[in-house]
Amino acid sequence: MKITARRRARECAVQALYSWQLSNNNIADIEAQFLAEQDIKGIDVAYFRELYSGTAIAADMLDQLMVPYLSRPLDKLGHVERAVLRLALYELSKRQDIPYRVAINEAIELAKTFGAEDSYKFINGVLEKTASQIRPHRK
């Protein structure tokens, strides 16, 4: 299966978010470092930049969207799971042109790639509940 430029952008954004969450370094510095050090061939760089910086800037707001639907405290959430959830919630809340089902399915695939063994199930559950609040008409 060919990986699309947008999927690659999402994968890279999750990796950059993970680095940012662990290091708490400047958002722009991590973006520049990531783009300089990673193989960005085949990625939608503009979409990566929007996803990464938009998600990082809105992280506190995105966290508040997911908190009511978490089965554990936010600070007990794994860094990968948090990055994937934040990114998907950014797409759901800020990118109305992305169908909600696409945002959720992409998050599930990211969790399968980067997360713990069954984290995709947890992420799917949180996003399904959160999506109904963010996009009540499921578009």
From Swiss-Prot:
Database matches in InterPro entries: NusB-like_sf, NusB_fam, NusB_RsmB_TIM44
GO-annotated biological processes: DNA-templated transcription termination; transcription antitermination
Cellular component annotations (GO), alphabetically ordered: cytosol
Alphabetic keyword roster: RNA-binding, Transcription, Transcription antitermination, Transcription regulation
CDD domains linked to this entry: Terminator_NusB
Any GO MF annotation of the entry: RNA binding
Function of the protein: Involved in transcription antitermination. Required for transcription of ribosomal RNA (rRNA) genes. Binds specifically to the boxA antiterminator sequence of the ribosomal RNA (rrn) operons.
Protein family membership: Belongs to the NusB family.
Name listed for the protein in its UniProt record: Transcription antitermination protein NusB
